[in-house]
Amino acid sequence: MFVKIYQYHIQHDRVDEYLAIQEKVSKIYGKYLDFHTMYLNSKNDATKWIEITRYKDEGEYQKSLHFINQDQEIQDLFEEFQSLLLNDKNEISEEDFNFTFSMKSSKIKGEDSF
């Protein structure tokens, strides 16, 4: 499996817009890829978000990304997303990982396992 992790800061009063954008982006990505995304909001800094997405493999991701990036709606949504970033913390960090393994406790109940 292939994992992408993004970190960024969203203006605290624009979180609803952020979530709406992410929902639209997910629908577009879903046309091309199978994926699972988790959005984490820091308990210490309400503006800090981490986005973790798991894909089947990097090759499938790279091949699909070519088509996704040609979609005008994706370009427009990315511009909208950038407008939600904090002015003084407008950087988006991105890192790639290979998924190695996971462990799960049977006592933890959640919506979906990552």
Report residues per predicted region.
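A beta-strand edge to alpha-helix "cap/lid" segment located at domain peripheries
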Residues: 3, 62-63, 100
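Active-site-flanking beta-strand signature of metal-NTP-handling nucleotidyl enzymes
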Residues: 3-8, 50
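Short, surface-exposed ligand-recognition loops at beta-strand->loop->(often short) alpha-helix junctions
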Residues: 9-20
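An amphipathic, aromatic/His-enriched active-site/gating alpha helix that lines ligand/cofactor pockets
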Residues: 24-37, 54-93
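Short, solvent-exposed loop/turn elements at beta->coil junctions and helix N-caps
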Residues: 38-42
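Short acidic/glycine-enriched loop/turn segments that link adjacent beta-strands
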Residues: 44-47
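Acidic/histidine-enriched, glycine/proline-rich intrinsically disordered or flexible terminal extensions
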Residues: 93-114
